[in-house]
Amino acid sequence: MGDLIFIGSVFCALISAYILLFKKNIVHLFSDRILAFLFLCYSYCTIGYLLISSGWLIYFPFLYRTSAPVNYLIPPLAYLYVKSVLNNKNKWQWVDALHLIPFILIFINYIPLFTMSIENKNAIVKMVIDNYTNNYNIKDGYLTENIQFLRPIQSLIYILLQWRLIYTFEKNNKSEIFQEHTAIVLTWLKKFTIAITFTILTFLIFVIGVIYSLSTKQNINDIVFYSSIPVAISLFYLSSYLIINSNVFLGLPYFDYDKNNIKVEVLDKAKYEAEIEAIENLISHEKPYLKQGFSINE
């Protein structure tokens, strides 16, 4: 069941990524590309899992562990997506490169595996398919596979930062301009973050199960199977939501929210009402329309 949901979620994620990358909304192109890349990373990691669970990885041993570094891109990409939408960011900054450090470190760690001969990879893949516990017992890189437990720590840090962004935005930005559309996008960001939070919680349960199984020397194949189902549902929800609710692709109105809308000059209500009152007084008291030759240009 979990595998079928995963396949559906990958399909929806790829469709969403295609729409995000090739739609003609230039204003929000930056945040759209971040989200598209996030879906592509999710899809690649999911395919990596499906290859192991189905046993098909034996036909593609060169792909073994290639999704491990990519996993460390997902939490920062989700955070940067929310940040870019709420703050109307339209380009990368040098400081954003710091988010790539975990990805780079994990990639370097697995260089010995990536450069290993196909014969040796085949032997490792067979052991992992036979017993998923070997995924943690076999040392594939410079460090032991305990390094994989850094992933839930990274995920927790980023999801807390993600919720903080949303909370700060709601607290500091009370503008009524485009309030309805802002509410739609903000609702999507909350659902997006809730789904990721749900994924992280199930992932933490999975990690606890793995630690218990390793300590008691039990097979963890069943734990992997059951924990994959809520993760699959979460990813399917995220990817299909965008296809059904395409209006969130529009992003937020392009205001400088970092400055609390102080310099935004869009229909200043007080000024607008004063101008309307001045026009009404002019028409009712001076009656310029009675003058011969009067035109609207005056």
Regions found by a protein language model. Give the residues of each.
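Short, hydrophobic transmembrane alpha-helix segments
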Residues: 1, 18-28, 54, 58
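Hydrophobic transmembrane alpha-helical segments in integral membrane proteins
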Residues: 1-13, 148-152
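Alpha-helical transmembrane segments of multi-pass integral membrane proteins
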Residues: 25-44, 142-210, 221-230
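Helix-loop junctions on the outward
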Residues: 26, 44-67, 204-219
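Alpha-helical transmembrane segments and their immediate interhelical/interface regions
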Residues: 52-87, 147-159
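The cytoplasmic-loop to transmembrane-helix boundary for the fourth helix
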Residues: 87-116, 126-127, 182-195
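Membrane-interfacial helical/loop segments at transmembrane boundaries in membrane proteins
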Residues: 122-138
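Membrane-proximal linker segments that couple transmembrane helices to downstream signaling/catalytic modules
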Residues: 240-298
